[in-house]
């Protein structure tokens, strides 16, 4: 009888064949702009820790206090034995920061979308999303059983055409989009999308994972920066600029109450570890009040962008802390990243199927120094000269 698991080997071989095979690399040391990767000291330009808070002593102390007070884990679903006062304090802090009535915290950002979208729509409904939406937005849409339609990246005219064609055929419609796109760094035209949602009677879910802590007067994200006041669903993560772990959904009190009862990835899973919640709560306070930290991040972004322009490497348009470089096909991009690593820079290649075209993805932190940025620019200059 044939091996029922034999297909796995064939699939792995196909990943190797097309250059899509990936492995993990071990990072050691305190989270920050300098780490050891596979035993080699490098400058870290792949982390989503945009404000440099993950290794901040205040977050570490908050997490340690929570462990001593509550123990290592939440021990159960928050609807059973897993609710702690720090969960509610975090939700109230996030809701206040985001300008919403209430908030619900999940165990990860992925779970937040995987639970929220199927709770809002079902088989009689429509989900419309940007073709470059994060996998958890697309996964949530597919899991819901709703009709799922994608429009070309950033094309609001195509979005409107889809709504004209499809909206009247369905009971409810949910528009899903990232605000800042994780593999490009560009900010979408949220004001136009919000207007289309209003005109066509659609719910709107905005994933602020890469905008929270980075954009807006207080760092609350693109929704704050653009001054959007229309009722919408603000989703985000605690694991990027906030330096901890977990996800959240902010919105009306009624929406949050509904999700608390209907979002399966909240109801049927263990609550966020109290230590992660406490660290995130401290991070919200820091991100909201320490505006110089965001100013440092913006300076680093501008310095690196200018350096890349001077070298002449093609880069994608970006509005955030993510800069993506085009250096060739899959093989060339992989080799380019390998040579950067030899120069002491960790900036791995991002390849299909994660993105449609291979690229070097650089992410910046407020804690990168000017000297670190200049070291990256020097390494890019050296490596690109060997590839030209």
Swiss-Prot record:
Keyword Cell membrane among record annotations: no
Catalytic reaction annotation: 6-carboxyhexanoyl-[ACP] + L-alanine + H(+) = (8S)-8-amino-7-oxononanoate + holo-[ACP] + CO2
Entry annotated with the keyword Transferase: yes
PROSITE patterns, A to Z: AA_TRANSFER_CLASS_2
Cofactor(s) of this protein: pyridoxal 5'-phosphate
Functional pathway: Cofactor biosynthesis; biotin biosynthesis
Molecular functions per Gene Ontology: 8-amino-7-oxononanoate synthase activity; pyridoxal phosphate binding
A Pfam family hit: Aminotran_1_2
PTM-bearing positions, type N6-(pyridoxal phosphate)lysine: 240
Domain of life from the UniProt record: Bacteria
Binding site for pyridoxal 5'-phosphate: 109-110, 182, 207-210, 237-240
Assembly information from the UniProt record: Homodimer.
The family this protein is said to belong to: Belongs to the class-II pyridoxal-phosphate-dependent aminotransferase family. BioF subfamily.
Protein name from the UniProt record: Putative 8-amino-7-oxononanoate synthase
């Amino acid at each position: 009888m044939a091996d029922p698991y034999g297909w796995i080997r064939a699939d792995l071989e196909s990943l190797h064949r097309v250059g899509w095979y990936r492995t993990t690399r071990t990072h050691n040391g305190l989270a920050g702009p300098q780490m050891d990767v596979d035993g080699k000291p490098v400058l870290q330009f792949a982390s989503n820790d945009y404000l440099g808070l993950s290794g901040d002593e205040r977050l570490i102390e908050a997490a340690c206090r929570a462990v001593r007070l509550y123990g290592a884990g939440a021990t159960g679903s928050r609807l059973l034995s897993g609710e702690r006062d720090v969960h509610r304090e975090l939700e109230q802090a996030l809701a206040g920061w985001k300008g919403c009535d209430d908030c619900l915290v999940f165990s990860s950002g992925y779970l937040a979308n995987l639970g929220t979208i199927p709770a809002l729509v079902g088989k009689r409904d429509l989900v419309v999303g940007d073709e470059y939406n994060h996998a958890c937005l697309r996964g949530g849409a597919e899991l819901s059983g709703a009709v799922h339609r994608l429009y070309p990246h950033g094309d609001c005219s195509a979005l409107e055409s889809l709504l004209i064609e499809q909206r009247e055929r369905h009971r409810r419609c949910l528009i899903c989009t990232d605000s800042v796109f994780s593999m490009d760094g560009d900010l979408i035209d949220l004001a136009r999308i919000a207007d289309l949602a209003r005109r066509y009677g659609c719910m709107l879910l905005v994933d602020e994972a890469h905008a929270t802590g980075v954009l807006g007067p207080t760092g609350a994200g693109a929704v704050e920066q653009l001054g959007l006041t229309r009722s919408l669903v603000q989703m985000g993560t605690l694991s990027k600029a906030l330096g901890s772990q977990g996800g959240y959904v902010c919105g009306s009190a009624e929406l949050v109450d509904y999700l608390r009862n209907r979002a399966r990835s909240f109801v049927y899973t263990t609550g966020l570890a109290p230590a992660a919640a406490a660290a995130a709560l401290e991070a919200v306070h820091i991100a909201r009040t320490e505006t110089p930290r965001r100013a440092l991040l913006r300076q680093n972004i501008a310095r690196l962008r200018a350096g890349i322009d001077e070298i002449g490497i093609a880069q994608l348009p970006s509005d955030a802390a993510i800069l993506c470089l085009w250096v060739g096909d899959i093989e060339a991009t992989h080799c380019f990243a390998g040579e950067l690593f030899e120069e002491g820079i960790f900036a791995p290649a991002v390849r299909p199927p994660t993105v449609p075209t291979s690229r070097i993805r650089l992410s910046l932190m407020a804690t990168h120094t000017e000297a670190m940025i200049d070291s990256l620019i020097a390494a890019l200059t050296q490596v690109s000269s060997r590839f030209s």
